[in-house]
């Protein structure tokens, strides 16, 4: 089945990776040199993926979780016709399509951004979850309209990361059949021999999760690799294939050592290695025509045939199930149904509710009118109000179910949501307590880097949590999330702001959203619908203003907005001119014009107070050197919530006191 041309192709891929790294004088040659045979076998014999048709919905997904081995992926993309050779020559250089670690939306053929070890593995679980759910929802007899695999190339480091344990446990529990992990098991980590830090029995570990385990003893045996992948595709449940490789294979002096993990070979070792491969070291970035032909006649031919057959099946599916087909096409587009927002609840002045509860009510309507809406909670659905009441649970028996039980696996949940968003066909969300956002912070960051439409629900947003005490009362989390570029961090002040916050979350196609919601009830602000709609979308707006000459600005978010209004009304009775500004989304506000910002925060009004039950970090930008911030510079306390709030100075009386001190 395999012949000398296959070996030439593998060694060419190795050589391209080496040359790219040598030219950049930066990179990780060890993994591409060791893992090239398994990647080649997967791409030429199994992968249903055409880089030139990168948006084909039913393609297989390939995730290089070991993102430091990016030169391998770029070499594969080149020989399969997606990436120009010149881009390999610009590896890790400014403006190139070959950055140090693979970047989603930056390079065609890269499914997700990887590099932070373990996250690619966990995002792959999310992709397999998306495939399973969409297949359960749309597939019919003779119409497997969603039917593809998620393949992962993972390293020792990926499997050491804690997130891999969370994600593997979840995948095994849910028996995600279409998930296949190729584990590059080379017994070397960056610092040295793996046995200095890692001695797990991979077989026992993954079988305990409910995975299938296959061992490939020789990572250069193409038939053994091919047979293992074929076997994995025939089994129920996820499969990990441990492929024993030699890091830096072919390097006479560095193979099998950590010296080849993260540094160029050097010119002398490069020449020796090329001779080991039977290649001419004088030729750089050389790709024989036979190598291109192999990929054209195998991978690309197969992918084109599969895509053509799928398009014909979709046409027949559309005739047999027209309504379902329209829903599927809308899901593939990533768009929302027209006028979906008209179905969302509006709240009058008689309403008082926790923003988490209002969000829960909104979620019921979103699930009804946005079929692609899908997600769950990290074992806090009852508290987060995040489950869809009329929907089934997602599991292996009811994959069409809409409520995902992520369990107490916050980090894996966050990464899985990102995987689902990158997969397409869904508007995914995840939920937990705000204080536990720290557990999934790296996934939040990666969602922003990738520009994903991921939504994260964070409830119990302040010291008003009360009795649970400082471990469960967020302080620094708001400032931390606001510091992430390209992240909507929305802390709504009432049910109507919460409604618009959800609209922003779903409509922000390339910006993830964190919804920061209260446990305690909030009265409805006396503001008309259009003002709220426009104001929340712009990040800050006026919710109350006296008729007197403007003298004071009170800025707040969330539950503190109503407190600011109460203080402003007292000041109004004293004849003071005061404006209250709700600032639910700093990120959106910073994108507004200078004219809009000036209309909200007039520069000639310097007596300003910001009120927020969190770290004051960041507010000084808005209050200026003459202003004050009523915030919290310590951790919370355990007591009834109302008492804790009072003790920390979040009272009308303290606001008035601070105003008088200006």
Swiss-Prot record:
The record marks 28, 261 as: Important for catalytic activity. Its cofactor is Mg(2+); Ca(2+); Mn(2+); Co(2+). InterPro entries: THDP-binding (IPR029061), Transketo_C/PFOR_II (IPR009014), Transketolase-like_C_2 (IPR055152), Transketolase-like_Pyr-bd (IPR005475), Transketolase_bac-like (IPR005478), Transketolase_BS (IPR020826), Transketolase_CS (IPR049557), Transketolase_fam (IPR033247). Thiamine diphosphate binds at residues 68, 115-117, 157, 186, 261, 436. Binds 1 Mg(2+) ion per subunit. Can also utilize other divalent metal cations, such as Ca(2+), Mn(2+) and Co(2+). Binds 1 thiamine pyrophosphate per subunit. Keywords: Calcium, DNA recombination, Magnesium, Metal-binding, Thiamine pyrophosphate, Transferase. The active site is at residue 410. NCBIfam families: tktlase_bact. Catalyzes the transfer of a two-carbon ketol group from a ketose donor to an aldose acceptor, via a covalent intermediate with the cofactor thiamine pyrophosphate. This is Transketolase. It comes from Staphylococcus epidermidis (strain ATCC 35984 / DSM 28319 / BCRC 17069 / CCUG 31568 / BM 3577 / RP62A).
